[in-house]
Structures are given as structure tokens and as C-alpha cells.
């Protein structure tokens, strides 16, 4: 490092101090900040004013097109669109526009922490219990985010990327500017010009599927503050604290004649010309320039995910920590470039191999230029840093090796003529093409290749609404929120697919935690095996009311199928003076109306399940006349009981009695009477025994609860499929009664049917659910079904599943992708995504989300609490039992202990 010394000379002791000696004390030492080009930012025009106080610049932040599991055809289309943007969006001038792109990773999830906290506060239910649960959940998530950003990474990803996986955010910043002369006689001022070009640029980028936003001085300052103060003493190197502590004041709070550049450096930068490095906070920094392309680049060359050997990663993933990539394009008029190429062609005369190669290259360049493939002067620079000169040299060697392996030829540090100047020239908005006369660093690159090199490719980040927080393979947050109307096109109904071992249970516990914490949603869970018992205990721990029900003969649980019969009768009589069962049958079959429930149709379906026992063969024999008889019996049962003055609901035995009455009706044909008797006998099986316990009792009303968990219990066993379907229908009716009554509050309702393949095997249940969920869309009630596979789903479920906008598939095997295709039209791109999902036990599972507005591959790395609550394996139960015995605590407290242990690993 260069010696630090006072400016000027030490006066001799035997001579008087002269005015010249005193003047040296007042000299302003040269500073790197003096070379930074911007002097001000205008909020009204959203432009930066450059050092000449005349030229203007615009800054943007880019979110690249998702490249995970994308086909080569898709990437080629993106490349073509980017090339069009380069060629035709930014006009060419003799004094040209410059487009600079910078890529850097922020090893921090502080923005996600703030976003989640703000999002939760804006949506959380304002009761003491929900606020307590929400604050605890957010705090745990924030600790999880902090743990993810540790320098060593959270884990080694041996399955996909082949490197350490760490939480971070990849930031791509773009600068567009043109230096103008005061007397250039152009008819448009620089600010108007830059904004017109910027508007076209933004429009074209958005049309390509690239996210783009305009940035201001706060964005520039926050970024460069981290760049130039990598180990600030004031915060002991904590860059998140630094950006909070040293945030840029608002315009009205800034001191007179403030200089944005001077505010950026908390310690004086210094340089070491011998080693060609700048020192920021005593850390050496170096610029590495790419001299040439050794071979044609691939689409998304730097930031797109691609296959390399057995691994999938982006080139930028492998660069050393703290690296910054810069691509600087000069939008030069093509006639000037063509003249230059022609000069090369004319001078390439001779029989030497070098001359012949130059001639061939020049001819090839002119050919492609004639086809619209522009040649643009380009400078590619890698900024890197180290903890010491030795560490910097090690990282420089890593960068050079990586560039060479990927077809890019870097200039070796010992061959770099002006390394300190190179660093300064390539800083944001600092490059001036007209001054590059000697030691030219720019190289002519075809726009088709630039369209592959530019960092406009990336990984999906979702919609940005942290209702559900996941990550991508690069460690960046991937968030979306089905319950947010901005993220959905139609509804928030969801289907979650995942074979055993795919992490489906952990995913659903994690989803429930977020839904109850962020929205305070009313939760209903239908499950098998007690997978969500601990989740219920967790909610109860914070004061939420929890009702856990098991479908077992010893439990006082009643789900009467015909409880809505009186309401049905009232509605039908109100609609028409003379009730016509046949007309109602036609209306029920043809209605797509979601304004009002089809109560009679729902009860008919329940009766049909009782009559057929859920047997598909018997259901196939069910005629229209049979259905009409069933409806008549339900209506007669309601009318008779109402006429008798009974206040008790209509029970199954009442419908059986009505059916027996129809079997004795002499006005009917013998065949119909016989069929009515058969159906009455079949339904009578549900009036006694276990079935009668569940479906032929008034029972007691279910308590109001924040969380209701119904364990299928006995009915999940083989041979009880019909009763399970009826039980599921009964709970749906219970839920519907609540959400209809509470439809004017702000609270959403989330209904999860776990192990849905056990429930939906009966085609009639799918028809029933279609009827009921049509209403739920307008009641803010969202049904999610989770299942191991779709193989057991009948074809009749297609209409139901077509109503579900959100499909989440966890690590699906090939056969399951084929099953998905039975119910949902999949594009080749979507099939490719589904095939690409991977898992690494103990670290992560991947899945694919498909909705109308979002299609992406995500990585589930839930917080330890979600994992601990989802642990239902025998060895996991043994672990909790040991903790309970050792610490004399409850099972939930043992869960917290397991979560804390996972957090400290």
C-alpha cells in the first residue's frame, strides 16, 4: 500500500515558514470522489446531471428473464428480443449514447425482512393473539434469513449447483447516458432526450418479459456506499447497518452545496500503482478487462442458469464474493463502424496468414452487418476485491480461469497498462467514448452476441408479495401470494402434488404458518395421521382457539347430510309457488351460476353416495328417474317434518321414511316403487351403527374456532370410502355455514384437504365440490387439496381441478407429470420445469408453481420451526419424547427445542 503522508514539505528548522509553505497546508488532496461524474439528481425528471452540468443520465434496475429449466427455443426468442432492443430502441449519434450494465450480489436478505414485516403488519388480523403469533413468526423468519446469509452458506448444494447455497439478492443496474456539448445545436434538451429514449427502452424491455424500474439517487447512493465501504469501521463491516446508519437524507434535509460523491467515502481511498489496485477500507480492489471473445457466447452467458457438466449454475454464481461485472456498450452509428471495417478490409492485403484472416473477418463482419447484426464497441470489466494482496491475487486467478473456461480472454494484471485509470473509467456513468483514443479497451461485438452476454437473464423471483416466501437456486427470494388479488387472475384455490418424501407435509405446514401469521385466516384442515396436530398446538400456544376433531365412534361428532333441507325448502318455495322437482333437476345439471348454492343438488349427491356405497358400477346404473325420486324423498322429508312442527333438523332416517312412502305410492309404476324401496333399504344402512353415529344424529354444534382440524380417523381405513366422502361433505357444509355468516368481515378462510387422493376417489364428491367452491370464491374461502398423486382422481374431477388456479408440484416423477396432463394442459416448457425439480434431503426440496400469472421453479428452504412442526416420523417422535423427558416440558416446547437446535447447526 502506498505510504500515507502529509501534503507538502516539512519546513527546515533553521528557516522561516513561507507563504508557500502555508499554502501547501490548504491544498485539497486528489481524491477518487473527484473523478465521479454526477453532480446532482433531479426528482422531477428522474435524471442525474453529469459533471458538465448539462448532460443527463438515467438509472434502472433490471429483473432478468427466468432461465431455470427453459428450452433453447425460449432462450433464443429472448435473445432475439434483446437484440431488437439494442439495435432499434436507442438512437445512434456521432456523440453516442452509452449503455452500462452492472451485476453484483448483495449477500443480505434485509430487504426481504423489511418487506415481510411491512406486509404482515398491513394484513395481520388485529387481535392480541394474532398479533403475538405474527410478530413471533416474523422474528423467526428474520433469524432464518440472517442464518441463510452467513459467509459459508447455509449448505453445500451437491445435487444441482455443485457449490455452497447462500441467501442473497442479485442486482442488475443499468445506466443510460449521452454526453452533450452546450453548443451542439440539437433541437432537444438533454433531459427531454434521455427521458424519451428511456421510455422506449423501458417499454421494449417490459415487452421482452424483463422487469425494469427507474432508480433515483437513493438507489445509486445505497449501492455505491456498500461498494466503496466494504468493511466500514463505524459498523464493523456490517453493510446492512451501514446503509441504515448512513442513509441518504431526503432532498429538503440535505446540507447546502452537498456533494453526493463525497458522501460515499467514509474513509479516504488510496491507490497502489505498483500492484494496480485501489484500497477501500484497506481492502485491495482491482479491475480485470476482457480483451476478446474466444468463442461465441451462449444465451444468458453470465447470469442465465445453464448445464455445466453434471451441475446447473450461472457463470456469475462462481465468481468470488464481492465481484461486480460491468458491460459497457457504445451505441455508435453503424456507418462509422462500417467505414472502420472497410478500412481493415482494404489494409488486409498480402499472403500472410494474419492478413488473410483479417480479410476474412472483415468480409464476415460486413456480411452480418448487412443482415442487421450491428457491431458495437463494448468493454467488459470484472471488479474484484480481496482481504489482502495475496487473497486478491488468488481471486484474480480464479476470475481469469473462469473467464477463459467460458470463452472470454482477460487481460492479465501484469499486461494492464493503466490499471488504476481503468478502474475509474468503468465506474457508473464515467465512461467517455470520445476520450478513448489511446489504449482502447473497447472491442467490436455483434449485437447478437451482446444479446447473449447482457445480464438480462436470471432466475425467477415470483411476484414480490411475501405471502409465501421461497427461494430460487441462486439463493434469491422467490415470493408470491395466492391470497393477494394482484397475484391471481381468477381465484386462490390450490392443488399441491408431491410423492412421499417430496417434502409436501413440510411445505403445507409452512404454508399454513404463513397464512395464519400474515392474514390471521380462519383455518380448516382435513387430514389423516395427525400430521397437523403440532400446528394446532402451536396456534393454541399463542391464544388462538383450536378445535381438534377425530372421526371415531367414541367421539361426539355428527355430520348430518340433510341439515340444509329446511333452508332448501324455503328457497325453492320462495322462487316458485309450485315446486317442480324435474325443473330443479335440469337447473342443477346445467347451472354454472355461482351466485347461490344448489342445496337440493348437494343433498341429492350425498344420498346417491349412501345408496351406491360409493360403488362406481352402481352409480353408473343410476337413472334420471332415480335421481328425481331421491329429490322427491328429500323434499317430502322436509315438508313432513316441518308440518309436524318439529324443530329438529332433517335426519337420514327421515329421508329413508320418505323413500319408503314413495315405495308405497300407488300412482307410481311398480318398477319405480321397487327402485324406491331398494334405495330406502340402502340408505337405511346409514341410520344405525358407526354410520348412524356420524350421519343420523343431530349432535352438538361445532364450536367457533380460529383453527379446526378434522382427523379422518376410522373413516380413512379401507372399506369406509363412502363414509369418508360423506364426512368430507359434512365438514364442507359446516364451513359453508360459517363463511356465509361471516362473509362481510375481512378475514379469509383457508381450507386444506390433505391426502386428497383418499377423499376424491368418489366422482360424486368432485361434483359436490364443484357446486360448493363456486360460491366460496365470493366468500373469500379458498380450498387447497394436497395429494401424493393424481392417479386415484377420477376423470370426473377434471371440472373441479380446472377451477384451481394454483398448482404446486413437488419433485414429480415422470408418471405423475403424465397424470397432471390428464387434468391440465401442459406446455413443453412446463413439462421441462416439472422434470427439472430436485431435492436434497435435509437441505431443500424443489417444486414448480403454475398459475395464470406465474410459472416458475422454486426451492423450499423453510425455517426450522416449520420443519420441527412437520416432523411425524417415528425417530422424530422419539427425539421429542427424549427432550420432553429430559427437560420436563410439553411436546410443543420440545418442538421449539428442536427448532432452536436446527437454527444453531
Give residue spans per PLM region.
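Walker A (P-loop) phosphate-binding loop of P-loop NTPases
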Residues: 501
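A short helix-turn-beta junction within AAA+ P-loop NTPase domains corresponding to the substrate/partner-engaging
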Residues: 545-547, 797-810
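P-loop NTPase motor domains
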Residues: 77-88, 314-317, 420-478, 484, ...
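Hydrophobic anchor at the beta1->P-loop junction of P-loop NTPases
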Residues: 496
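Conserved H-loop
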Residues: 528, 754, 778-781, 785-795, ...
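Hydrophobic positions on the alpha1 helix immediately C-terminal to the Walker A/P-loop
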Residues: 507
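Extended, folded cores of ATP/NTP-driven motor/assembly subunits in large transport
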Residues: 1-444, 455
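Conserved lysine of the Walker
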Residues: 504
